[in-house]
């Protein structure tokens, strides 16, 4: 068994902190883990958040708080080098969960082109620069059908970009229980076909979220998609 979505953000870049995850994985009989950081944690990715920051006061405050604890990627890589020099009973991969903004795909490519990380997870947390998964009340008065359509369009673009190994929590749009009044089978099918064509994996992620809808899962399996 493997867990490729473990965030480090509550601790420091030390071997001792990472070894806590190793010990926990051993207890759970997990043979492989991937230690991740969100892209907003690094200055190199901050240009991708420019329009999102400017979207409203809440998002400006959210981003400015993240800046206070931001680091440079080289720090994470030095931490990764230290881990790769060790020999653990649990295999450790290193990765990034990258917020996908289609207008900044070039920045993402430039920052990650050195191939240092084992896994790059692409995630859609923002619909045209609006963060849909942080506050339920911000959904009020919005066109749920339009948001769902746009969400899947953005995921299609993330898959087509060729930037990522895994599409992270691809059903996150359901986080607050709002659902469209139309059938999503075609959206599921189109996305799964693109994921399959790119050789990507689709993430099964139920942490603080709804996980994949059964219909989404069925379509993914029918398309021959592989999961992480």
Question: Whereabouts are the PLM-identified features?
Answer:
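Short low-complexity, flexible loop/linker segments enriched in glycine and/or proline
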Residues: 47-51, 109, 136, 217-220
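An N-terminally biased module of ancient metal coordination in phosphate/nucleic-acid-related enzymes
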Residues: 1-102, 174-194
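A short helix-to-beta-strand connector/capping loop
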Residues: 87-91, 116, 225
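Domain-core and long-helix interface of multi-subunit machines
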Residues: 98, 115-117, 122-224
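Short, structured secondary-structure boundary patches
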Residues: 52-60, 216-228
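Short, acidic/polar
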Residues: 14-24, 103-111, 150-158
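Short, conserved acidic/polar surface loops in the N-terminal third of protein domains
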Residues: 45-46, 103-108, 131-134
């Amino acid at each position: 068994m493997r867990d490729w979505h473990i965030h480090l953000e509550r601790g420091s870049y030390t071997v001792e902190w990472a070894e806590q995850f190793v010990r926990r994985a051993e207890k759970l009989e997990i043979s492989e883990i991937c230690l991740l950081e969100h892209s907003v944690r690094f200055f190199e990715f901050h240009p991708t958040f420019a329009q999102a920051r400017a979207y409203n006061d809440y998002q400006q405050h959210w981003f400015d708080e993240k800046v206070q604890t931001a680091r440079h990627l080289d720090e994470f890589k030095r931490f990764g080098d230290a881990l790769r020099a060790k020999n653990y009973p649990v295999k450790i991969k290193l990765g990034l969960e990258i917020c996908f903004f289609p207008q900044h795909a070039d920045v993402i490519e430039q920052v990650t082109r050195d191939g240092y990380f084992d896994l790059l997870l692409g995630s859609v947390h923002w619909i045209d620069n609006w963060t849909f998964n942080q506050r339920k009340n911000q959904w009020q008065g919005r066109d749920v059908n339009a948001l769902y359509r746009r969400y899947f369009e953005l995921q299609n673009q993330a898959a087509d970009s060729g930037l990522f190994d895994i599409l992270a929590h691809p059903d996150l749009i359901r986080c607050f229980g709002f659902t469209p009044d139309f059938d999503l089978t075609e959206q599921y099918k189109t996305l799964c076909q693109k994921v399959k064509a790119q050789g990507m994996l689709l993430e099964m992620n139920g942490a603080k979220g709804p996980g994949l809808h059964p219909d989404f899962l069925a379509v993914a399996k029918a398309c021959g998609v592989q999961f992480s």
